[in-house]
Amino acid sequence: MAKARRRRVRDTWKEKKWYVIKSPKLFGENEIGTTPSRDPDFLLKRRVEATMRELTGDFSKQYVKLKFQIDSVAGSEATTRFIGHQVTTDYVRSMIRRGTSRVDAPVIVETKDGYKLKVHPLAITIRRAKSSQQKYMRQSIEEHLREIASEKTFEELVEGIVTGKIASEIYHQAKKIYPLKRVEIIKSRVLEEPA
């Protein structure tokens, strides 16, 4: 029986270059990480995650995960844009206790510069609330969040969401309806950018 001829395998790993990924201007253009690629065009639309602690050094914000997408490459640096954030599930679970109510109020908001975002606030009550109270609280949170977003630019809104300033505004407004333990914006996602 004839032996099959061995084909020479080309090592594509040697062709790859390393690119430094930078965070957007809003987060200080810090280095998030590095990634290999054969062609800079292959980097576009890649998604990267980083915690707030990695970007700011603030250990108290360890539970906030920021999501970025590479939108341009210049030389060996890839710049990103913010596409959303999420709070870790173990942090959310640690807030919820027996005898409390969890009020979720996801809402689509539009900023004054034309960005559309889906924002997911979570309110936790001190004691169990009636469904009518929860419904009223949900409506109040949604209205207040739409109002806040319409007055801010995209960067101001993202900064407020990530730092917790908007969550504290919502807390002070919603606690008038029912005593609250905590309000947190657990998730956000950019849906549309202005043309």
Swiss-Prot record:
Identify the keywords attached in UniProt to this record, alphabetized.
Answer: Ribonucleoprotein, Ribosomal protein
Q: Which SMART domains match?
A: Ribosomal_S3Ae (SM01397)
**Segments crossing the lipid bilayer:** none
| GO BP annotations listed | translation
Q: Name one Pfam family in it.
A: Ribosomal_S3Ae
Gene Ontology CC entries for this record: ribonucleoprotein complex; ribosome
Q: Which domain of life is it from?
A: Archaea
Stored InterPro entries:
Ribosomal_eS1 (IPR001593), Ribosomal_eS1_arc (IPR030838)
Q: Which GO terms describe its molecular function?
A: structural constituent of ribosome
Task: Decide whether keyword Ribosomal protein is in the record.
Answer: yes
Check the record and name the HAMAP family matching this protein. Ribosomal_eS1
Q: Record's NCBIfam families?
A: PRK04057.1 (NF003142)
User: Could you say which protein family the record assigns here?
Assistant: Belongs to the eukaryotic ribosomal protein eS1 family.
What name does UniProt use for this protein? Small ribosomal subunit protein eS1
What is the species of this protein? Methanothermobacter thermautotrophicus (strain ATCC 29096 / DSM 1053 / JCM 10044 / NBRC 100330 / Delta H) (Methanobacterium thermoautotrophicum)
Q: What is the lineage of its organism?
A: Archaea, Methanobacteriati, Methanobacteriota, Methanomada group, Methanobacteria
Coding gene? rps3ae
